[in-house]
């Protein structure tokens, strides 16, 4: 049990720590030159006996303008359930004080493990006092600086090793990038973007890679991304056939990260791979000739509105490249982002259905040469519905009874087909 605060704000709190170090000459008091890699790992195991080996660590040692020693470790997080924020132990002259260091260590660094030891941090005072204390602010800034320097050193000295660690540290770095201006400034050259081929790029490297082929008519570089690679496979492949590159952005934090990059960089615009048909992902002044007449376009439009019945989703008939799928479902970037941000912030969308646009490729042979020319109305509706279901299937939207009916109808057609 430890006491925190003073006067009316003083409270007792029970804590459970993996191990309190009572060694008279603990590792963090030694010079880094005296220590081997195994020494650091052994000390980590002493602190957290049941944890996997850490990814890397930072040895803190400064005596002016404040006194601070310690070792901070980057843990290997196996699952989201491993994320705990009370893993940094605060000591004062080697005497354990607390594991609640949120007023001393920046929030984005609370995922780190380890020990910090400083006699200059005032004890048994209110949190508001701690926040205003000049030593505490300097210590917080120093820790942030050392973490950024360590990350940059790893990136410069062992790029391949840094890339291998990125799945474990990427979310942490992005969080710091978003929440601390000084940290953002220091690590901006070490932030990595991963594409769907598993290649890593810095922000500047990626900008250089795609600028020639993915700059829109307004001079903005269009960054295409997917947050669910398997669900978006057909969209990704279609983009690749046009020579486009696609990023993998599948972490919860990536929604905020994307908007931050758009705001900071100015010449970037991010579009999820299913936010529009492939021909229109990179806006340009080029037009594709329309093969159908106005009345034929109207006929296709009415057919799909009838197939979709009471659906509130928009139907658009567009002239696209003939190799683009006959029917596609796209989810406009702005509306989808707004919905996702509201859900992230805990705002319930109730039973409101997801809004999307059904795009019919009027230049596809199945639309122009077959569907449009069918005289049997029932057969025409069945084919229109089948093409729509294929589009839903490619978006993982065909589920439940609709999926069962789709499978059964295909089995019936196969059984009726002569072999």
Model-derived features: where do they sit?
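Conserved GHKL (Bergerat-fold) ATPase module
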Residues: 1-419
